[in-house]
Regions:
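Non-catalytic, topology-defining segments of multipass membrane proteins
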Residues: 1-168
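Active-site-proximal inter-transmembrane loops
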Residues: 115-123, 177-188
């Protein structure tokens, strides 16, 4: 009730959060970081690649090169020694511990060059990897100017927090529970 009285439960702000979640998580991380950059599942003009990459940074899951390196290392060592977020080290570790205490997002240049040599040659990706938080700062300022604090709370803070847990559930829950459709050595 206090939130509603303060104007923080504004429906337009919630709709902005849902739209930005789709843009950042689905387009940015799912299509951009994951399918395009990590797996090179399709080709696109560089401007589209850069747009999707910037959208991915709005999820605040790290720079594009660090995200790709983490995911490629995960596939190289799926649910075994060397996997940054294996659930075999515990559900808490797979969900959030690896982000707080692990090596993810803390790669030196040699590891990045080994796992993402394609991206290390691209000046835009190198730059965005260093300042990945900057697009979200600009978006936050625009939302504040356009809609006030309710937009910032819903479309930035709550959206990013919700998306963190949605992403982490993929690393924890989907590798811990469910049925395995194909015979593999990992827990996915």
């Amino acid at each position: 009730m206090v939130w509603r009285a303060a104007g923080y439960l504004a429906v337009p702000a919630l709709l902005a959060a849902i739209l930005l979640w789709w843009i950042s998580a689905s387009l940015g991380v799912g299509v951009g970081f994951h399918r395009l950059l990590t797996h090179r599942g399709f080709k696109t003009p560089k401007l589209v690649e850069y747009f999707l990459t910037v959208c991915g940074t709005l999820s605040l899951e790290g720079g594009p090169i660090n995200w790709v390196v983490t995911h490629r290392i995960h596939h190289a060592h799926a649910d075994g020694p060397g996997d940054p977020h294996t659930p075999r080290d515990g559900g808490w570790w797979a969900h959030i511990g690896w982000m707080l205490n692990g090596t993810a997002q803390k790669y030196d240049r040699s590891v990045m060059a080994r796992y993402a040599p394609d991206l290390m040659k691209d000046k835009f990706h190198l730059w965005l990897n260093r300042v990945y938080w900057l697009p979200l700062v600009f978006l936050s300022l625009a939302l504040l100017a356009f809609g006030g604090w309710s937009y910032v709370m819903w479309a930035v803070f709550f959206r990013v927090t919700f998306n963190f847990h949605a992403t982490w559930l993929v690393n924890s829950a989907t590798h811990m529970w469910g049925t395995r459709r194909f015979p593999t050595e990992d827990d996915s």
